[in-house]
C-alpha cells in the first residue's frame, strides 16, 4: 500500500519512529498571481476560479459541504478537488486541523490563523514578495512549528499547502537555488506545461544575480506558503516527526530548508523529515519527481498506492489519467491513515467515495465484476 521511492532506509526509520503516532494536519494557504496566467494550472477552470481555490478548499475542509458555502468549490477542468481525499481522512481519523493564511486575496469564511502575509505578485516580475515579508513569514513558521510540536508531542505534523500556481513558483525557487529542476516538476495538467513554466521563471531570474540567498530567491520568484512551511519544518524537527505533504511544491520547500540551514547555520534534524505525496505525482511520466528528489538527497519520498481505477465516480477515475494528482495534503493523509490505522485500498476508497456521495448527492453503485 505504501511505496518508498527514495532513501528507503531513512524512510523506514521515520516510519518506525513516527508511523504509529496520530497525525496533526496543518495546511498553509497562500496565493500567487502566477496562478492567474491562462493555462498555468488546472486547479480551477478560469483565472477567476483559481483566485478562490484555496479559500474554497479551506471552507470545505472545515465544513465538509458546499451547501450554503460562502465560497463553493470551483469547477476544475476535470475531476474533483483533492480536498475530498483529505477531508474524508482527517474526519475518519479525528485529526486536529490547523489552517494558516500566509497570504490570500480575501480571507476564508472559516477560522484561520492569520500570519500577516500577502499574496505574491506574478513571478514573471522578479519581485514576487518584499524581502522583509519573506523574513517575517519564516519567523512565523519557526514560532508555529515549535509551538505545534510542543502541543502535540505524541503526534507528528503533516505540513500541507494550497497554492494555485505553486508548482511554477516551486520551479522558480528550485532553479533560483541552483538546482537543475527543468523538466522534473509536475502540474495539475495531465501533461506538464514545462515550457510555459520555464519561460516564466527564466524571464524573472534573468533580472537577478545568480548568487541569491534562499530568502532572496523566494522574494524574487516564490510564494508566501514556502517560507512558512520551511520554518515550521525546521523548528518542529527538533522534537517531532514532520511529513512535508506534497510533491514538487514540498520538494522545493525541502530545498529551501537545506539552503536556509546552510546559509543561516540553523539546526534541523533531517532524519525527522520525509516528503509524502501521491503515486499520481511520483509516477507522472510528464515530470520526474523521483529524479528531483534524488537531486536533493537525502530526502525520503513516499506515496500510497491508492488507486481510483475501480471508483464508481468519473471525478475520481480521472486521477488515473493524470488530472489533479495532489493538493491539500491528500497523499500524506492517505499515508497517515495507512500507517496509523493500517487502512488499505478498500477502506480508503470507501471513505472518499462516501464523502462524495454525501456531498454530490450521487448514489454510489458498485461496478459489475
From Swiss-Prot:
One MF term in the entry's GO annotations: nicotinate-nucleotide-dimethylbenzimidazole phosphoribosyltransferase activity
InterPro entries: Nict_dMeBzImd_PRibTrfase, Nict_dMeBzImd_PRibTrfase_arc, Nict_dMeBzImd_PRibTrfase_sf
Domain of life: Bacteria
Bilayer-crossing regions: none
Gene3D superfamilies the UniProt entry points to: 3.40.50.10210
CDD domains from the UniProt entry: DMB-PRT_CobT
SUPFAM superfamilies: Nicotinate mononucleotide:5,6-dimethylbenzimidazole phosphoribosyltransferase (CobT) (SSF52733)
PANTHER family: PTHR38811, UPF0284 PROTEIN SLL1500
HAMAP family: UPF0284
Family statement: Belongs to the UPF0284 family.
Protein's recorded name: UPF0284 protein sll1500
Source organism: Synechocystis sp. (strain ATCC 27184 / PCC 6803 / Kazusa)
